[in-house]
Design a protein with these regions (language model features):
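A beta-strand edge to alpha-helix "cap/lid" segment located at domain peripheries
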Residues: 1-26, 30-131
């Protein structure tokens, strides 16, 4: 479990640095996400968005509400993410989000152990109202 939570922290750090290439290490070859713009994205799409700087954050904060290892090779993590946008691509369905705006999201991440290393397999996130 600690390995998965550390991986999640490293992914947040990479997102802050705009490190799309780092996501190559973190994402499963079969990665799929349902993102806040109600778009299904696969691994290469996500890496390209971060590598190009089309998605960028000036801050990312995560609060874990639930984390459990459901099988030897599966961990589920649920919680909230608060991000401050430093770039917003115009073709992602988030055109109304302003640079500098804070977004709150609920997320579910499913990690799978592949070839001895934990990788993010599935991500779902939904924008929630700012409290």
């Amino acid at each position: 479990m600690a390995e998965v939570l550390a991986l999640q922290d490293r992914m947040n750090d990479a997102a802050l640095r705009g490190g799309g290439a780092a996501f190559d290490e973190f994402l499963s070859k079969n990665f799929v996400a349902s993102d806040p713009s109600n778009t299904i994205r696969h691994r290469d799409d996500m890496i390209a968005l971060f590598s190009s700087g089309r998605i960028a954050y000036s801050s990312v904060k995560t609060a874990i509400d639930y984390a459990d290892q459901l099988a030897e090779d599966i961990v589920v993590v649920m919680g909230t993410e608060t991000t401050e946008q430093s770039a917003v691509p115009s073709d992602t369905g988030l055109e109304s989000v302003a640079i500098g705006e804070t977004l709150n999201r609920r997320f579910t991440n499913v990690y799978r152990k592949e070839d001895g290393a934990w990788r993010l397999l599935i991500k779902q996130s939904t924008i929630t109202p700012v409290k």
